Structure formats: structure tokens, C-alpha cells
């Protein structure tokens, strides 16, 4: 997963 505050790996976000 990428970094960010998205849901799972969608919206360019990562798992937080």
C-alpha cells in the first residue's frame, strides 16, 4: 500500500 490516509489502497492512500 502507498502512503496517505486513503482506504486500503484506493484513492492513492495506504493502510493506516
UniProtKB/Swiss-Prot annotation:
Its main location: secreted. Keywords: Adaptive immunity, Blood coagulation, Coiled coil, Disulfide bond, Hemostasis, Immunity, Innate immunity, Secreted. It comes from the Eukaryota. Conversion of fibrinogen to fibrin is triggered by thrombin, which cleaves fibrinopeptides A and B from alpha and beta chains, and thus exposes the N-terminal polymerization sites responsible for the formation of the soft clot. The soft clot is converted into the hard clot by factor XIIIA which catalyzes the epsilon-(gamma-glutamyl)lysine cross-linking between gamma chains (stronger) and between alpha chains (weaker) of different monomers. GO terms for biological process: adaptive immune response; blood coagulation; innate immune response. One of its GO terms (cellular component) is extracellular region. It is found in: Secreted. The keyword Coiled coil applies. Heterohexamer; disulfide linked. Contains 2 sets of 3 non-identical chains (alpha, beta and gamma). The 2 heterotrimers are in head to head conformation with the N-termini in a small central domain. Cleaved by the protease thrombin to yield monomers which, together with fibrinogen beta (FGB) and fibrinogen gamma (FGG), polymerize to form an insoluble fibrin matrix. Fibrin has a major function in hemostasis as one of the primary components of blood clots. In addition, functions during the early stages of wound repair to stabilize the lesion and guide cell migration during re-epithelialization. Was originally thought to be essential for platelet aggregation, based on in vitro studies using anticoagulated blood. This is Fibrinogen alpha chain. It comes from Mandrillus leucophaeus (Drill).
Amino acid at each position: 500500500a502507498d502512503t496517505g490516509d486513503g482506504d486500503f489502497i484506493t484513492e492513492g492512500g495506504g493502510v493506516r
